């Protein structure tokens, strides 16, 4: 059965580094071996901000204040489901890092991020985050291979 999955993704930034999660602890993880930001699936009734705060707390032990929404990602039929992902960054947080149940947490220098084993789409949308451009993008994969993508940069002024 094909489902629509809502999720969040957050890149926590501090002193020229980004907190990344090396997904190595769960053998059946669709992201096993990849480096990702933090985040995960919505629970019933959550807003994107509530979801990203809960997921970051669960995965890292950090409590976010004022996460900033940067864009929306859509991955149609990715591993059998349609994924809609709200992408955030955060620079304001408290707490101490825990031993994550999802993988190994590490602060990575921003200039070294693209050298990590990332999903191909991450290489494309990282610059949009750094440029501060709000984006809405669709990335289509066949297996683990990115086949096509499209992006819009909607005007976000009110």
Tell what function each PLM region has:
Residues 5, 13, 29-30, 80, ...:
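A generic fold-level signal
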Residues 3, 17-19, 28, 54-58, ...:
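Recognition helices and adjacent regulatory flanks at domain boundaries
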Residues 13-17, 26, 91-96, 132:
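Short, charged/polar surface micro-motifs in flexible loops or helix N-caps
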Residues 18-30, 34-44:
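N-terminal first-folded block
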Residues 42-65, 75-128, 149-158:
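Unchanged
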Residues 71:
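Catalytic phosphate/metal-binding cores of nucleic-acid and nucleotide-processing enzymes, i.e., regions
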Residues 129-148:
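Short, active-site-adjacent segments that bind or coordinate small-molecule cofactors and metal centers
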Residues 1-20, 41:
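Conserved N-terminal beta-strand and adjoining loop/helix that marks the start
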């Amino acid at each position: 059965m094909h489902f629509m999955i809502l999720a969040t993704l957050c890149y926590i930034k501090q002193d020229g580094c980004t907190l990344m999660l090396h997904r190595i602890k769960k053998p059946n993880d669709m992201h096993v071996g990849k480096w990702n930001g933090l985040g995960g699936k919505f629970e019933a009734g959550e807003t994107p901000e509530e979801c990203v705060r809960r997921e970051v707390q669960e995965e890292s032990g950090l409590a976010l204040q004022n996460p900033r929404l940067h864009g929306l990602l859509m991955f149609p039929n990715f591993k059998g489901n349609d994924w809609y992902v709200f992408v955030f960054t955060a620079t304001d947080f408290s707490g101490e890092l825990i031993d994550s149940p999802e993988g190994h947490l590490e602060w990575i220098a921003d200039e070294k991020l693209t050298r990590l084993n990332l999903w191909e789409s991450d290489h494309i949308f990282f610059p949009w985050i750094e440029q501060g451009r709000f984006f809405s993008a669709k990335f289509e994969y066949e297996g683990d291979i990115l086949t096509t993508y499209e992006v819009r940069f909607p005007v976000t002024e009110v």
